[in-house]
Amino acid sequence: MATFKEHLQERSAHSIGRVNAHGYEDSNFLLTKLTENKMSCPMTISMLAPTLGTVGRINEESRTRRNAGYPINFEFDFGPVIEFLNMRLNNAGDPFMECNYGIHSKKFEIAVLDWFARLWELPKDQYWGYVTSGGTEGNMHGLLVGRELFPEGIIYTSCDSHYSIFKAAKMYRVQCIKIDTLFSGEMDYADFRRKLLQNTRSPAIVNVNIGTTMKGAVDDLDEVVMILENCGFANRFYIHCDSALVGLMMPFIKQAPKLTFKKPIGSICISGHKFIGCPIPCGVLITRLMDINHVMSTNIEYISSNDTTIAGSRNGHAPIFLWYALKRIGYNGLCKTVENCLKNAQYLALRLREMGVSVFLNALSITVVFERPNDETFVRKWQLACQGKIAHVVVMPNVSLERINMFLEEFTKSRIALHQDKCVAGDVSQENCLCSLHLDRKKEAV
């Protein structure tokens, strides 16, 4: 029986174009044709190799080692599946439908989707989903389904939401109401209730953050549902959960609130290149099949598939990498990894506080928020994500205790050299601010 790889090779061989003995398009042939073009750049492989080698060394030795501000997991080794990059995989159209283009990885994609549907407790015959290009596309799709179900609806989302939520509202020309947040980054539920009551005639399309971008705050899904029902929106709301980073972690944290389709939510999306560490930017969206069948089931004859996704042509390599990562680490591995990240985040927050740095860490979060360093060279060196007066470190699996201690040592030297004393009470609360003003007030209170 032919393997999946052999099956793809056979399909590739029947595609129009020149193929080699392995069934792949001949890259040397393509390169020759490219360089024969008089308008092409006269660069040879020998000229290109040193440049690529230098870039690779820089990325590996300095960038990768000191990436602290952005949630990327560098721990996974995808060597065993790298050779699939030689294949021209395109998961065009609906993942559950065979399309006319036969070189795809939809079987892997469905396996990944099944895994997440089980994780979030949506039965196999009731879910639909696909592997997206990332969290932004997942948010765009979730909100689009909400808009199609409730054309007159208003989008409600907190001020701390990812910028893609506001982008989607603008693209779809849907009114978007921003909800105030607490200093923690969590939605201000009193403000949410107040703004709902000002617009009772229009259905509510609500984005619930399961881990905000800057502070890792988790909105209370149960509280949001209760407020919607108490304000007269029963059966007139759609909830999308932006779970880019934390959505994969929460099911493995015993004390965490449950993220499940047993609650009245419409869709959940995560990023595949963050906690899982897929080397290709991607994501996963899971939603309810009945909603897709109701609002997004137009058939496209050209590809012999339904138009249910945002993108037409979709990356066929990402599902293979996601499948491999999930199979390799497993449920037990994810439990241990999540637990270790939480412990390391608490360690970093404690050490920063001992250094006299204003710091804040949400419960059950791996995003450590602290005063923005004045040294921009240090910020760039550690690739810190900054916003106003604050910065953060996202303690991913590759951010080990060794790297945390290295970061702390360099940050200490930087602060001493620049005599940093910054008030960030407005961002982390007076209780967590350790500037000279608030330290003096605390001493006076004692």
UniProtKB/Swiss-Prot annotation:
Biological process (GO) annotations held by this record are: carboxylic acid metabolic process
Q: Its domain of life?
A: Eukaryota
Q: Which UniProt keywords apply?
A: Decarboxylase, Lyase, Pyridoxal phosphate
Protein name, UniProt field: Serine decarboxylase 3
* GO MF, any single term: pyridoxal phosphate binding
Stated family = Belongs to the group II decarboxylase family.
Q: Which reaction does it catalyse?
A: L-serine + H(+) = ethanolamine + CO2
Identify residues that carry N6-(pyridoxal phosphate)lysine. K274
Name the residues that bind substrate: H162
Q: Which InterPro entries match?
A: Group_II_Decarboxylase, PyrdxlP-dep_de-COase, PyrdxlP-dep_Trfase, PyrdxlP-dep_Trfase_major, PyrdxlP-dep_Trfase_small, Pyridoxal-P_BS
What does the protein in this record do?
Catalyzes the biosynthesis of ethanolamine from serine. Decarboxylation of free serine is the major source of ethanolamine production in plants and ethanolamine metabolism is crucial for the synthesis of choline, phosphatidylethanolamine (PE) and phosphatidylcholine (PC), and thus for plant growth.
Classification via SUPFAM superfamilies: PLP-dependent transferases (SSF53383)
Pfam families recorded: Pyridoxal_deC
Q: Which cofactor does it need?
A: pyridoxal 5'-phosphate
NCBIfam families tied to this protein: PRK02769.1
The UniProt record lists the EC number as 4.1.1.-
Signal peptide (from-to)? none
